[in-house]
Each structure stands twice: as structure tokens, then as C-alpha cells.
Amino acid sequence: MLEVNNVTFSYSTHGEQDAPPALHEVNLSIPPGETVAIIGHNGSGKSTLAKLLAAILKPTSGLVQVDGLRTDASGEDLWTIRQRVGIVFQNPDDQLVASTVIDDIAFGPENLGLPRFEIEERIQEAMALLDLEAYAEMAIKDLSIGQKQQVAIAGVLAMRPRYLLLDEPTTMISNHTARRLLDTVYRLSQERGISVIHITHFMHEVTGFKRVIVMHEGHVLMDDTPTSIFARAGELQAVGLDVPMVTKLGRRLHQQGWSRLPEVILSIDQLKANPCSSN
């Protein structure tokens, strides 16, 4: 369980202790196996929250816990947290550390001190999950940005985390590659019980998640299912967000008399499953 209890966080710059809080008295919990999308405009606090959950940052006040372990701890507890919580950043170059694909994926398991046979097993498994077998010996510098992001995710998955944090990992890659990556991690959540926390500003990416958290000015503004969140289009627009295009289309058709359609449509498949017929 990831738990955030009354957490406030401020970035101190140049020694100033009175910086405006990036997060203010945030409370939430994420149980094992849950898929959660966190959305919000730039500066809403969503990436700060991710870094707190991964113990990269420590709260200014309040408490963040991973399976009961405090993220402001040190030593063995902190080491355990960083094994259990994997994070993938927006720019893969920020976390790729080796010169070849296979060496980068091996980096995490090797630092866990695992036997060689288990390291090899994890490498092969992670490469298969992300379709990277053909690129094993390729130099990182020769990869596209999308391929680099696949390697970054594979490296995190090779650590076999319980919680996978995706901090806007699709911003720099194509829609096709983004869809494949999200399908892979969503499938892993279903098959292995990994919690996936996906931070994004692309509304169409969150429709398949069980839960959506909306951040605004360091606060949790909404926390509900995608259907319930996107039913509140006016409130989202008031904080600089919007609903997916397919949701807009479904609502427009519903308003024009296509009564078989649900009021909130989340996918093209839903449109296909509800043939339009007007009153």
C-alpha cells in the first residue's frame, strides 16, 4: 500500500524556507494491484507527488509510507522502498546509464546482488515484455527516443517492483509507441498485481485506468473513476483540463438524440458497441 498522510512539500531555493508549497496537505492511498492515473496542468504537483512516492523527495511535513515503511527513513528501509517502487521519467536519457541495451537493463538487477542466473532471467524477461530482443547489443545512443523509453521501462521492470510510477513517459514518443507501452504495463498489472501510477496530461491515456486523481495547485481536486471524472467536464475545464475527444463526440451525439449511447463514452469500442439510433 502506498499511503500519503497530510503531506505538504515545498521546494526550497537559495536557502529560502518560505517557498510556496508544491503540495499542500495531500491525503491518498493506493492499494496493491490498482491502476491509477494522475492528471493536472503544469505546476499542479503531480510530478512532485511521484517523486515523494518514490522516496526521491521527502515531505516537508506529513508522512509518506510504502508498505508501512516511511520514505523519510534511511538505511535498509530506504533501500527496500527503492526496490519496491520503480519510476520512469519523461526523458529516458535521464535514467539510462549504460552504453548498450542489455547492459542498461542488467544494471538494476546487478545492483541487487542477485545470482547471475537470476539476473539473466530478468533481463530476458524484461526484453521480451518490451520487444527488445533484437536490440540487445545495440548502443543506446543509436536508439530512437521511443526505443530508449522502452529500455528505461524494461530496466525498471527487471527490478520487479511492486509499484510502477510513470512520470509523463509518453510526452516525447509517438502515439503508437505510447499505446504499446501503456498496454504492456496495464497487462502486467493484471497478470502480476503490480500497481501502476501513470502521471500524464494526455486525457485519452487515462480512460483504461481504474481510478483517476486530478491535481490542482498542490491539492487533490478529484479522485474517482474515469467515467465519473469525465462527467464533470465543466469543472475540468475550469482548471485547464479537458475530456478526451471520443468523450466529447459521445456527449454531442447523446445531446442530439442518440439515446442508446451512455452519457460518458471513454473509447471508440464503446461507440461501436452502442449503435446510434435517435429518438
Protein language model annotation of sequence segments:
Residues 39-41:
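The feature captures the beta-strand-to-loop junction immediately N-terminal to the Walker
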Residues 218-219:
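Conserved ABC ATPase "signature" C-loop
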Residues 54:
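Helix-to-loop junction immediately C-terminal to a conserved catalytic motif
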Residues 164-167:
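Catalytic Walker B motif of ABC-type/P-loop ATPase nucleotide-binding domains
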Residues 139-143, 147:
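Conserved ABC ATPase signature
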Residues 117-135:
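Conserved ABC ATPase "signature" region
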Residues 63-80:
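ABC ATPase NBD Q-loop/coupling interface
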